[in-house]
Amino acid sequence: MDPFPDLYATPGDSLDHFLEHSLQPQRDWKEEGQDAWERIERFFREQCFRDELLLDQEVRVIKVVKGGSSGKGTTLNHRSDQDMILFLSCFSSFEEQARNREVVISFIKKRLIHCSRSLAYNIIVLTHREGKRAPRSLTLKVQSRKTDDIIWMDILPAYDALGPISRDSKPAPAIYETLIRSKGYPGDFSPSFTELQRHFVKTRPVKLKNLLRLVKFWYLQCLRRKYGRGAVLPSKYALELLTIYAWEMGTESSDSFNLDEGFVAVMELLVNYRDICIYWTKYYNFQNEVVRNFLKKQLKGDRPIILDPADPTNNLGRRKGWEQVAAEAAFCLLQVCCTTVGPSERWNVQRARDVQVRVKQTGTVDWTLWTNPYSPIRKMKAEIRREKNFGGELRISFQEPGGERQLLSSRKTLADYGIFSKVNIQVLETFPPEILVFVKYPGGQSKPFTIDPDDTILDLKEKIEDAGGPCAEDQVLLLDDEELEDDESLKELEIKDCDTIILIRVID
C-alpha cells in the first residue's frame, strides 16, 4: 500500500474506493493495535501501582477508557492514535487532579521505563507539555512488531467525575456546575468526559465515520505534513466535530450521502471559519443557571467557537492556526476530489444553528420563531410585522442576565450581539414622536416603554404601574443618580431614545 496516497489526485466520485483501499484499517494492523493496548492496560491494572505508595496512599485503577480514533471507531490504516484514560482513586475532585497530576505522571513514567521489557514492545516514553503548563499526559511511542509503523498512545490520568455511565446517559447538571466552578484551564479536565466524547462519535453511522476518516487523512497528510508536527494548528477533534455538524445540517443526519459532497461541505466551513459557532445540548444544556450563564458567556467569545459536546469549558476553536487551515481548505476545493460536486449538489450548512427567539409583547401571548443568527435583524422584524400586523415602527430589545437592555439594530445580525442561543426579545410599536426608554427594576431586569417626549415623569410612572409595576406614588425614578420630578417632561429633562431610567420602589 502507498503510505501517502494522493487525495488531491483522486476524483470526488472515486473517494469511496480511495477510502476502502487506502484508509480503512486492515485486520492485522487493528489486531496489533489492540494487542498493544491490552498489554499496556494490563500493566496499569496489575503492575504499575502494586506495592507502591503514591501521594501517601495506595492507588487503585477505577477504570480504563479508550479514547482517540481507536475508541471512536475512526482509525486510519497504519496511523493509530489511542488515548488511554486512567481513572485513579487518588483523584477525588477536579482540584485534586490539578494539584497532583504532575506527580502522578512522573510516577507512571518511572514505572513504565522500569517495567517496559515486560510489555513485549519497544516503547519510548515522552512527556507531553503544552507551553509552560504542567504536563497532563504521557505519550508512548510504541514500535510495531510486524512493520515500521508506530502506534502512538497518550496516557491521561483523570478524576472519575462521571462514575458508572451508560451510552445514553446524561450527566447530572451538578457535575458540570462543579466543573465550571473549579475554574481550570479551558478543557483541562476533558479526559474525565472521554466516555461521552467517545459515545458522541462511536454511535454515528458507518458512512459518517468514513467521512471522518477522510477529513482526518486530509488533516494529517495535506495539512499537518505541510506545516510540520510542531506547528500550532487546531486539533483533529475540532475538525471531527465540524464534520459531524456539517453532516447533521447538510443531510438531516441521514446515513445516505455522497462522500465528495460531505467533504466539500467541511472544506467550505473551514474556509469560513471566522463565522463558525457550534455547540450541542446532548450532555449539558441551558436549564441549570450556572451552566446557562457560562454557556452564554462562551458563545459570546471570539469565533470560531466549537464547544466540546461533553465539556463546555473546552472550546476547540480557541487554538491558533485557523488561517493555515482555511488556506489549505480553499486550495483543496480547487482539486479534483472536490470539483465533481456541482452547485445544486452542495449541502446547505449554516455557520451556526438557527436561534430560537421568543417574541414578547405586553398584553399578548408569547410567540416563537427561529432565525439564522447571521441573517439581518430587519428580516426578523419583517416576519414579526407580518405575524402581528404592525403598522408603526418596530423597536425590539433584549437583555442578558446581569447585563443592560439593548436595542437590536435592523442593520445588524444576532451574531453581531453574540446571540447564538435561545433569547427573549421585547417588541414595542412606536409612532412619531414617541421614543423608547428602558426602565431598570430593582432586581436588575429592564423593561422597555414607549412614551411621548412631552409626557411627564408621572405619565411614565403610570405606564410602569399599568405594566404590573409598583403604584406610581411608591416609585422613585433616577437618571444619572438624580431623582426625576413628577411634573417635569422627558423633553425638559433631555431624556433621549433608549436611555435607561432606574426605578426604586419606596416602601413606607
Swiss-Prot record:
It comes from the Eukaryota. Residues 435-473 form the Ubiquitin-like domain. Its cofactor is Mg(2+). Coiled coil: none annotated. Strongly expressed in spleen dendritic cells, whereas, in bone marrow-derived dendritic cells, the amount increases during the maturation process. Expressed in many organs, the highest levels being in thymus, lung, and bone marrow. Keywords: Antiviral defense, ATP-binding, Immunity, Innate immunity, Magnesium, Metal-binding, Nucleotide-binding, Nucleotidyltransferase, RNA-binding, Transferase. It catalyses: 3 ATP = 5'-triphosphoadenylyl-(2'->5')-adenylyl-(2'->5')-adenosine + 2 diphosphate. ATP binds at residues 69, 213, 216. PROSITE patterns: 25A_SYNTH_1, 25A_SYNTH_2, 25A_SYNTH_3, UBIQUITIN_2. Produced as a latent enzyme which is activated by dsRNA generated during the course of viral infection. The dsRNA activator must be at least 15 nucleotides long, and no modification of the 2'-hydroxyl group is tolerated. ssRNA or dsDNA do not act as activators. Its EC number is 2.7.7.84. GO terms for biological process: defense response to virus; innate immune response; interleukin-27-mediated signaling pathway; purine nucleotide biosynthetic process; response to virus. InterPro entries: 2-5-oligoAdlate_synth_1_dom2/C, 2-5OAS_C_CS, 2-5OAS_N_CS, NT_2-5OAS_ClassI-CCAase, NT_sf, Ubiquitin-like_dom, Ubiquitin-like_domsf. Mg(2+) binds at residues 81, 83, 154. It is an enzyme of class 2 (transferase). GO terms for molecular function: 2'-5'-oligoadenylate synthetase activity; ATP binding; double-stranded RNA binding; metal ion binding. It holds the Pfam family ubiquitin. Belongs to the 2-5A synthase family. PANTHER family: 2'-5'-OLIGOADENYLATE SYNTHASE-LIKE PROTEIN 2, 2-5 OLIGOADENYLATE SYNTHETASE. Interferon-induced, dsRNA-activated antiviral enzyme which plays a critical role in cellular innate antiviral response. Synthesizes oligomers of 2'-5'-oligoadenylates (2-5A) from ATP which then bind to the inactive monomeric form of ribonuclease L (RNase L) leading to its dimerization and subsequent activation. Activation of RNase L leads to degradation of cellular as well as viral RNA, resulting in the inhibition of protein synthesis, thus terminating viral replication. This is 2'-5'-oligoadenylate synthase-like protein 2. The lineage of its organism: Eukaryota, Metazoa, Chordata, Craniata, Vertebrata. The gene is Oasl2.
